[in-house]
C-alpha cells in the first residue's frame, strides 16, 4: 500500500493515498488549533484541544473509538490538569460531547510502525498542507514551504514580520532581523 509516516512520502503520493485511506478507515477527523491557541495554551494544550475537537466531531457522527494511539511518549490527551484549564468553556463542551475517553496508548514513532497512525498522519499532513497553500500570501511562500522555516520563508519574515498565521510565542527565524530593521528605520 505504501502507507507510512507522511513525512517520508512525496506530496503526490500522500495525496493519492487520501481516498484509499478514507475507504479503509471506519471514520476519521482532522482537527486544528490556531496559532493564537498554541500561544495561549502552549503546544501540548493546543494538541489536547485539537484532539478533543476531533473526538467531539467523531462522537457527533456516533463514533467513539475503543482505543486511542498517540504518536510519541507523552499522553497529552488525558492529562487534563497539566496543560489546559478545564474551566475553558469550549474544552468543557468538547469533553462532554466526546464522552468517556477511551484508553490511550503512547507509541514512539507510531506513524512509522502502526498503519492506522500512519493513515492519520497522511490525512492530517494533506489537510494541513492544503490549508497552508490556500492562505492569503503577501510573500511568505505558504504554498511552497507550508509554514516550515525554509530559507525563503525566513527571509520573508525578516522582510514582512510575523503574520496572524505565525505562532508568536515561538522564536521565529528572521523576526529579529525584521525588528532590527524597524528599529533602525530601514525599509
Model region roles, listed by residue range:
Residues 1-187:
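RNase H-like, Mg2+-dependent phosphodiesterase core
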Amino acid at each position: 500500500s505504501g502507507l507510512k509516516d507522511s513525512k517520508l512520502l512525496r506530496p503526490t503520493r500522500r495525496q493519492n493515498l487520501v481516498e484509499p485511506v478514507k475507504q479503509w478507515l471506519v471514520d476519521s477527523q482532522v482537527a486544528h488549533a490556531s496559532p493564537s491557541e498554541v500561544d495561549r495554551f502552549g503546544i501540548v494544550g493546543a494538541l489536547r484541544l485539537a484532539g478533543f475537537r476531533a473526538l467531539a466531531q467523531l462522537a457527533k457522527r456516533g463514533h467513539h473509538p475503543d482505543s486511542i494511539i498517540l504518536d510519541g511518549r507523552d499522553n497529552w490527551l488525558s492529562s487534563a490538569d497539566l496543560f489546559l484549564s478545564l474551566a475553558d468553556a469550549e474544552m468543557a463542551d468538547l469533553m462532554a460531547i466526546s464522552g468517556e475517553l477511551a484508553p490511550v496508548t503512547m507509541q514512539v514513532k507510531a506513524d512509522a510502525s502502526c498503519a492506522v497512525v500512519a493513515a492519520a498522519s497522511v490525512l492530517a499532513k494533506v489537510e494541513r498542507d492544503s490549508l497552508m497553500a490556500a492562505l492569503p500570501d503577501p510573500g511568505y511562500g505558504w504554498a511552497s514551504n507550508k509554514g516550515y522555516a525554509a530559507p525563503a520563508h525566513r527571509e520573508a519574515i525578516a522582510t514582512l514580520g510575523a503574520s496572524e498565521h505565525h505562532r508568536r510565542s515561538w522564536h521565529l527565524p528572521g523576526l529579529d532581523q525584521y525588528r532590527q530593521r524597524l528599529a533602525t528605520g530601514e525599509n
